[in-house]
Amino acid sequence: MSERAPVVTIDGPSGAGKGTISQLLAQHLGWQLLDSGAIYRVLALAAIHHNVELENEESITLLAAHLDVKFLTGNDTDPVQVILEGEDVTTDIRTQECSNAASKVAAFPRVREALLRRQRAFKTAPGLIADGRDMGTVVFPSAPAKLYLTASAEERAQRRYNQLQDKGFDVNIERLLSEIIERDDRDMNRPVAPLVPAEDALIIDTSGKGIDEVLALALNFINQKLSDTN
C-alpha cells in the first residue's frame, strides 16, 4: 500500500507556517501526518522512559528503528497530538530535559539513519503530509508535490513574539529576530541536509498572507500535481 501512497512534503524555516498548514492539509485530505521536527524529541523521551543510556549509540539506534510514534490531528484549533507507545506525550517532549536529550541522540550517525528509515515508513495510504526541513530534498526526494514555505525573518520574529506573549512570557523581539537570523544561517549552510527548497518545490512566501490564502495556494498546487501523476 505504501508504494501507492502519495507524499506531500512541506519544508521551510521555523515560523513560516509549516506546522499549521501541514495540520490543515492532513485534516482536509484525511492523510497521515509526519512532524519530523518532533521525531528526535520523541526518541529521546522513549530512551528516558526505557532507561536507555543516551550515550549508548547501539541501544538508541535499536530504539529508533522500532519507534512507536503517531501524530494525530484534531480540529483546527487543537495542536497535533504526539502519541508515543499509546501515550500522549505532546507536552512531555517540549521540556528542557527532553530537548537536551534530543541534541545528544541526534549526534549519532546510525541513529539519524535509523530515523530516516522510520520517517519513510510513515508513507502509508491514503497519503502523507511530511512537515520538516529536508523532507523534499532528503527524506522523500521522489514526492510528487513539494512545498517550501518561507517568510521574512522580521515576520517570523513577530509571529514568535506574539505566540510567547500570548503564553505570558516576557520576550525581546530584537533578540528573537537575531536568533532567527542566526538559525537560518546555520541551517542553510550546514554540510549535511541544508535547508534549501527542492528544485521542483513550489515556494510560498507567507509574509502578509492569511492561513486561508496559503492553504488555498497549497491545495491548488497539490491537486494539480496529483492529477498530473494519475
Curated annotation (Swiss-Prot):
Protein name (database record): Cytidylate kinase
GO molecular function, one term: dCMP kinase activity
Gene: cmk
UniProt key word Nucleotide-binding: yes
EC number from the UniProt entry: 2.7.4.25
Entry coiled-coil feature ranges: none
Species assigned in the record: Shewanella baltica (strain OS155 / ATCC BAA-1091)
Record's keyword terms, sorted: ATP-binding, Cytoplasm, Kinase, Nucleotide-binding, Transferase
Record PANTHER family: CYTIDYLATE KINASE (PTHR21299:SF2), CYTIDYLATE KINASE/PANTOATE-BETA-ALANINE LIGASE (PTHR21299)
Top-level EC class: transferase
Annotated binding of ATP, by residue: G12, P13, S14, G15, A16, G17, K18, G19, T20
